[in-house]
């Protein structure tokens, strides 16, 4: 709630946008605000709650360990002990998550599945960041990357650092051009990986 208060204060502080400022600029700015990391909030409520708030604020969904239902509404996030709800799966379909928000994932230790589908702000840096996070290197078992136009071979190859990855689906990624090289990289780095390619 406090976050939306801060955002509304910032919005109210805008008296007049320049004439050259179109709606794309405004929404880009707003998405950046939604992705901004509040380290005090992470400290106060824990990494899973803070990451849940970030993901839902940006239009993604989360599912917690021991639950079948996806959390889709920021205002209906469960309350209770901070260590009770651990993120097991993230579905970022059509969300506005971007690299500046990925520090929200630093403390996550139980994420097993990530789906990035039609994420227009996802770039190689996001996948590079995921591959650097020790906790996620251990926990992520499945990942799907679909219709993310800014992802290239460089970002996909960074996924080889997710050492327990068992399943990787890559579909409709126009920036990925060296399919055979990807296959070789993953066969070497993750021999037990099921790699499913639906690329042109």
From Swiss-Prot:
Q: Which domain of life is it from?
A: Eukaryota
Using the chain's own numbering, where are the disulfide bonds? none
Subcellular locations according to the entry:
Mitochondrion; Mitochondrion inner membrane
Gene3D superfamilies the record matches: Ribonuclease Inhibitor (3.80.10.10)
InterPro entries per UniProt: LRR_dom_sf
Q: Which UniProt keywords apply?
A: ATP synthesis, CF(0), Hydrogen ion transport, Ion transport, Leucine-rich repeat, Magnesium, Membrane, Metal-binding, Mitochondrion, Mitochondrion inner membrane, Repeat, Transit peptide, Transport
Q: Which stretches of sequence are listed as region N-terminal domain?
A: 1-61
Checking SUPFAM superfamilies in the record gives: RNI-like (SSF52047)
Q: Which GO terms describe its molecular function?
A: metal ion binding
**Which GO biological process categories is it annotated with?**
ATP biosynthetic process; proton transmembrane transport
Transit peptide feature, positions: 1-25
User: Do the record's keywords include Phosphoprotein?
Assistant: no
GO CC annotation: mitochondrial inner membrane; proton-transporting ATP synthase complex
Residues given in the record as Mg(2+) binding sites: 59, 93
Where would I find the LRR repeats?
62-87, 88-116, 117-141, 142-173
The family note in this entry says: Belongs to the ATP synthase subunit s family.
Protein's job: Involved in regulation of mitochondrial membrane ATP synthase. Necessary for H(+) conduction of ATP synthase. Facilitates energy-driven catalysis of ATP synthesis by blocking a proton leak through an alternative proton exit pathway.
Q: How does it assemble?
A: Homotetramer. Associates with ATP synthase.
Protein known as:
ATP synthase subunit s, mitochondrial
Q: Which source organism does the UniProt entry give?
A: Macaca fascicularis
């Amino acid at each position: 709630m406090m976050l939306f208060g801060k955002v509304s204060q910032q919005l109210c502080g805008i008296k007049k946008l320049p004439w050259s400022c179109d709606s794309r600029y405004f929404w880009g700015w707003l998405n950046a605000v939604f992705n901004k990391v509040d380290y005090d909030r992470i400290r106060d409520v824990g990494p899973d709650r803070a990451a849940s708030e970030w993901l839902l604020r940006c239009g993604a969904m989360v599912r917690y360990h021991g639950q079948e239902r996806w959390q889709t509404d920021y205002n209906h996030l469960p309350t209770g002990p901070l260590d009770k709800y651990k993120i097991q799966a993230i579905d970022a379909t059509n969300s506005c998550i971007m690299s500046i928000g990925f520090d929200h994932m630093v403390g996550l230790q139980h994420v097993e599945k990530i789906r990035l589908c039609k994420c227009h702000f996802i770039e190689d840096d996001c996948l590079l960041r995921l591959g650097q996070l020790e906790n996620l290197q251990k926990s992520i078992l499945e990942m799907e990357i679909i219709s993310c136009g800014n992802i290239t071979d460089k970002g996909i190859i960074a996924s080889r650092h997710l050492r327990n990855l068992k399943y990787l689906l890559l579909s409709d990624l126009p920036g990925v051009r060296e399919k055979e090289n990807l296959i070789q990289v993953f066969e070497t780095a993750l021999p037990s990986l099921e790699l499913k390619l639906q690329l042109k």
